[in-house]
């Protein structure tokens, strides 16, 4: 069964398994997400639900957003995202989706925005080796030639050059849910997750679960 929700990254810690192994985990606040809209094959061409996360002040929101969220009767939300589902009839407008939809041992795909590191050179951005450090070298951290003059007389697209590093949408696949805290809507997910603390994440069933 397909499922997903919006979450917030709280940080990393570590837990210990029954056999004493230390497991690095990321703590994620998963929901609660409120169902705002249902989409079906008949009306939209596909089955999906639209959910909202983190309530905000209606007085500081546009009328279109307030009207859209009004049907759920749960206020206005800061983040609204859509998730494909197989059975739309399982959900009702206004339903709350929490961390309970996942269980320990499940595998999820996590999408977030990586930490922005600003304008960086080719060594940090792409892992270039660089030139000699001494003995008359004038080439230390420069990228080197980016194209000949006679041919191709231009710089090819996607050439690895200095530029913005990070601050882009990243998806990490097949991360395991180690522990679920239904009381506080927390998920402990094995390994690292893209983004800074308090960053917004999308959690979905892993496409590589099997």
From Swiss-Prot:
GO cellular component, one term: cytosolic large ribosomal subunit
Source domain of life: Bacteria
SUPFAM superfamilies according to UniProt: Translation proteins (SSF50447)
Gene Ontology molecular function, alphabetical: rRNA binding; structural constituent of ribosome
One biological process term in Gene Ontology: translation
Keywords assigned: Ribonucleoprotein, Ribosomal protein, RNA-binding, rRNA-binding
Binding partners and assembly: Part of the 50S ribosomal subunit. Forms a cluster with proteins L14 and L19.
Family: Belongs to the universal ribosomal protein uL3 family.
Xref: PANTHER family: 50S RIBOSOMAL PROTEIN L3, LARGE RIBOSOMAL SUBUNIT PROTEIN UL3C
Function text: One of the primary rRNA binding proteins, it binds directly near the 3'-end of the 23S rRNA, where it nucleates assembly of the 50S subunit.
NCBIfam families, per database record: L3_bact (TIGR03625)
Protein name stated in the entry: Large ribosomal subunit protein uL3
């Amino acid at each position: 069964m397909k499922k997903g929700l919006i979450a917030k990254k709280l940080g990393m810690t570590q837990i210990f398994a029954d056999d004493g192994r230390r497991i690095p985990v990321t703590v994620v606040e998963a929901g609660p997400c409120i169902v705002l809209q249902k989409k079906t094959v008949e009306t939209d061409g596909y089955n999906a639900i639209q959910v909202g996360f983190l309530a905000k002040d209606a007085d500081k929101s546009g009328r279109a957003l307030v009207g859209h969220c009004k049907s759920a009767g749960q206020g206005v939300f800061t983040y609204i995202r859509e998730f494909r589902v197989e059975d739309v009839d399982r959900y009702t407008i206004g339903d709350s989706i929490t961390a309970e939809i996942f269980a320990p041992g499940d595998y999820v795909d996590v999408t977030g925005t990586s930490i922005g590191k600003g304008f960086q050179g080719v060594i940090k951005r792409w892992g270039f080796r660089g030139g000699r450090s001494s003995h008359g070298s004038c080439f230390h951290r420069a990228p080197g030639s980016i194209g000949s003059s006679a041919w191709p007389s231009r710089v090819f697209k996607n050439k690895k050059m200095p530029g913005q590093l990070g601050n882009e949408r990243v998806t990490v696949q097949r991360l395991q849910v180690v522990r679920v805290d239904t009381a506080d809507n927390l998920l402990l997910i094995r390994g690292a997750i893209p983004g800074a603390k308090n960053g917004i994440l999308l959690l979905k069933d892993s496409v590589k679960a099997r």
